[in-house]
Amino acid sequence: AQGHNNGICWHNQLFLTVVYTTRSTNFSVCVGTQSTSTNPPYANTNFKEYLRHAEEYDLEFVFQLCKITLTTDVMTYIHSMSSSILEQWNFGLTPPPSGTLEETYRYVTSQAITCQRPQPPKESEDPYAKMTFWEVDLKEKFSAELDQFPFGR
């Protein structure tokens, strides 16, 4: 997509939607089902033909970094969207205040009160582990110098 407001990167992830078209290269692969040293007479059942479709994509991204002031309202909004964002930024968060007494002690995690051994930190669960994506590694190609790259359309 080209233009304003195309997306936001969170958790160092960016998703790109590709619409399938058949304008690339189609090719067929013919494979024999039996391997014999002699040349038997041709039979259609001795061969399997597969049709493959190859596509090549040239991806170009321009990222605009912005700075925001992390006020309590902004942090509350980010926390309501996804609390793991602020956890990855290593912000210590306290839950929202509650008026009832039982809610006051619900979030206490002191080892002196719970009498438990320290738990190892939980590994964050990948929400996309069951899905298949193409991975595009931008580590070596990422640069702040835009004049070093030709952008095509």
From Swiss-Prot:
Keywords: Capsid protein, Host-virus interaction, Late protein, Viral attachment to host cell, Virion, Virus entry into host cell. GO terms for cellular component: viral capsid. Self-assembles into homopentamers. The capsid has an icosahedral symmetry and consists of 72 capsomers, with each capsomer being a pentamer of L1. Interacts with the minor capsid protein L2; this interaction is necessary for viral genome encapsidation. This is Major capsid protein L1. It is found in: Virion. Forms an icosahedral capsid with a T=7 symmetry and about 55 nm diameter. The capsid is composed of 72 pentamers linked to each other by disulfide bonds and associated with L2 proteins. The capsid encapsulates the genomic DNA, but does not bind DNA. Essential for the initial attachment to the host cell. Belongs to the papillomaviridae L1 protein family. It comes from the Viruses. The lineage of its organism: Viruses, Monodnaviria, Shotokuvirae, Cossaviricota, Papovaviricetes. One of its GO terms (molecular function) is structural molecule activity. GO terms for biological process: symbiont entry into host cell; virion attachment to host cell. It holds the Pfam family Late_protein_L1.
